[in-house]
């Protein structure tokens, strides 16, 4: 039957996209395979290391963060759009909250090669379980990493997770952001950043933020909003600092 003008068809129905459709099917099959997932994790880690290694990085607050981590576990947070290259940049010895979905497991496999221990439970069903595990990691002396707008967004909207974790453990919160003079942006909900090779980049860690102990809902929401505002301001400062280096 001839196609009607204006009719909508899935991409797989068009020969033009058959190659990409087949590639997507093969990728999904590989993600479900233990060996395939491991191989993809290795390739992903290699890409991460290459993109980071081909940049000239200016790091602010990195040594201070490492010193704080030796004295007390930290809760390190950054927006989901900064996730791709943070694994090679973070101090080693952290535990990271990861999605239990196949793509999350691939990212966890790549991150593990850079010294990050995965903690499963970033999906809505596993949120309470993930929080309990993060509490256990902090009590055992390990710093933890959270993307507080992941894994589905909304973009740059901070969840209550970091506030709850800090209230339960007393651990301080460190904000992180990176930027570069040449970037790719993914057409995804978070507009994920990827550094183009052979450019300059900034990585900024904030000073430690201590949250006052409270059970008041309004006070907790004020803390959440404060962290969201400060993290957005840090991203803006990082972007502006990079622009100033042009």
Regions from the language model: what does each represent?
Residues 17-92, 109, 226-246:
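Membrane-anchoring hydrophobic helices of lipid-metabolizing enzymes
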Residues 73-125, 169, 185:
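Catalytic core of membrane glycerolipid acyltransferases/transacylases, capturing the structured
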Residues 157-217:
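A cross-family acyltransferase "interaction/gating" segment
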Residues 99, 121, 147, 175-178:
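Generic beta-sheet signal
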Residues 38-60, 98-139:
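Membrane-interfacial amphipathic helices and adjacent loop/beta segments
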Residues 1-25:
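N-terminal amphipathic/basic-hydrophobic helices that include classical n-h-c signal peptides
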Residues 133-165, 169:
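Catalytic-site beta-strand/loop segments enriched in glycine and acidic/polar residues
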């Amino acid at each position: 039957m001839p196609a009607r003008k204006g009719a909508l068809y899935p991409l797989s129905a068009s020969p033009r996209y058959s190659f990409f459709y087949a590639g997507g099917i093969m990728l999904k099959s590989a993600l479900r395979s233990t060996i395939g997932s491991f191989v993809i994790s290795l390739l992903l880690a290699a890409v991460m290391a290459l993109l980071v290694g081909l940049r000239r990085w200016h790091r602010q607050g990195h040594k201070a963060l490492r010193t704080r981590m030796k004295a007390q576990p930290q809760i390190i947070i950054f927006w989901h759009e900064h996730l791709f290259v943070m694994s090679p940049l973070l101090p080693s010895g952290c535990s990271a909250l990861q999605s239990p979905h196949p793509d999350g497991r691939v990212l966890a496999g790549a991150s593990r090669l850079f010294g990050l221990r995965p903690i499963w439970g970033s999906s809505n069903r596993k949120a309470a379980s993930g929080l309990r595990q993060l509490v256990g990691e902090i009590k055992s002396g390990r710093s933890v990493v959270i993307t507080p707008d992941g894994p589905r967004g909304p973009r740059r909207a901070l969840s209550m997770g970091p506030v709850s974790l800090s209230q339960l453990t007393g651990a301080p919160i460190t904000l992180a952001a990176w930027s570069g003079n040449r970037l790719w942006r993914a057409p995804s909900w978070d507009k994920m950043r990827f550094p183009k090779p052979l450019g300059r980049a900034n990585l900024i860690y904030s000073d430690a933020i201590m949250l006052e102990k409270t059970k008041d809902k309004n006070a907790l929401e004020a803390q959440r909003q404060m962290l969201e505002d400060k993290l957005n301001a840090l991203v803006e400062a990082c972007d502006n600092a990079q622009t100033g280096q042009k």
